[in-house]
Amino acid sequence: MTDPLSTNISRLYRTIVSSPWRVAATLLGLAVIIALIALGVRAIALQNRSLALLNWLNLLLIPLLLIGAALWLTNSWRRTQIDVARLRDEREMVEGYFDRLTDLLLTRNLRQATSDDEAARAARAHTLTILRNLTSDGRGQIIRFLYESALLNAGEPIVDLQAADLSGVELSRVQMAGVNLRNVYLTGAQLADVEMSSSDLRETRLDGSNLSRANLSESYLRGASLKGATLSEANLRGAILTKALFLDANLRGADLADANLSGADLSRADLTGANLKGAKLNGANLTSAILDEADISLANINKANLSGVIAGGTNFSGANLAGAILVGAKLNGAVLGGAILSEADLSDAEMRDANLNLANLRGATMNQVILVGGNLRDAIMGRVALSGADLSGCDLSRANLSIANLSRAILNRANMEEAGLSGADLRAAQLRGANLRGAILRGAILGDADLSRADLTKANLRWANLNNANLTGADLTEVDLTDAEVSAQTLSKAKSVSKVDRPDTSHFESAPAVVVPTQSGPLPNPRTPSYQRPASGRTNALGNPAAEEKPVNKSDKP
């Protein structure tokens, strides 16, 4: 915002230099003021002889100040006259240009000409020549005249302005729908509230331009450069922005729904509250971009780079982020329900309270991710890498985590009811107080895991590895520990093992095939072990043979 004092001084200065008489009056006034100051100093000096030298210096200073003031005002007046003359010359050039183009329109039927016609070539040459000698206001007048004369149509313009320099042009609030400004230099242009829908702006330079609230819907901006441009609340719905450059651009509240941003560079761009619903962002670069509260639902962000992105509360529901890079991204409170994140890299991402309900995270890399309080219910997470991740208090009920790497993961108080963890690697994982009721942990590795106070009621731990696991206070009611590797000492620390089913493994013809959790690829179908009914005897709940009962022989009856 301009300082009011500076504005008043500038207005006073322009008023003075606009007339020689005002300049002379100002000089006279300054002379009087300086003379009064000198007389005051002289009076003081006469009373004190030690100030006599100062008195003489003041007397010498008076003419020097007057000469300097006169030179400054004269030079200012001369510059003002030059500016006035330049504006007058510019006005004459613009009027001459209008007359020349009007003549071509009326006598040479310029509107019906093609870009190769002599009249069109003459109009283009005349236009490019005059644009070099005009100010931003004059250039704006030329563009408006060409558009209103139907010479800048988006399809095939009669006057082609490619490579024309329109830097700083003033076109705010101008109606120019369907204009062709392809490959034009519009750096620093003032285009606020401009109407340019369905326009051709391919490879146009718009760096640092002001496009606030501009309407560019359905426009073609492939390869356009908008570095540092202001597009707050701009309408870019359905626009083609492939390989466009938006580095450091301001897109707060912009409407980019259904826009094509494939390969675009949005590094460090501010997209707070922007609408990107259904947009195409394949291979786009969004490094360190700000996406807080933005709507990116149903967007295609396949293989895009979102490293370090800030997207608090952003709506990614139904979006395709397959193969995307989100290393170090901050997605706290983000909504990713039903999103596709297969093979995505979310290492070191922060996703507190994020909603990933029904999300597809198959094969994703999420090492060291922070997902405290997240919702991963019914999520598909086969072969996901969550080593060292913090999932405290997460809802993973019915999630598919088969062959997932959860080593050293923190899952304290997590809800994993009926979750599929077959073949999962949970070595040294923290599962204190976790809910694993009905969870499938067949072939899972739980060595050194902390399952203290965990609820494993009706969980399936067939062929699981529980060596050195901490089961202190764990509820193992109706748990299936068939062929599980667990010591009696470990089980003795559990809260309840009264109904643990652990048949004698000697009755299996062969050990079941269990895939090692670190093995890549899908989990093959394990061989179903064949269980032979023993000829005699039975086992108790903890697998200790009971006393054999002799078969009753009818002939032995008395």
Give, region by region, the residue ranges found by the protein language model:
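Charged/polar helix/coil "stalk" or linker segments at domain boundaries
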Residues: 49, 53, 68-205, 210, ...
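Residue-level detector of functional hotspots within protein domains
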Residues: 50, 57, 87, 477-480, ...
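Tandem repeat scaffolds
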Residues: 152-558
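Membrane-embedded hydrophobic alpha-helical segments
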Residues: 19-85
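Compositionally biased, low-hydrophobicity segments enriched in charged and small polar residues
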Residues: 22-25, 33-45, 91-106, 471-484
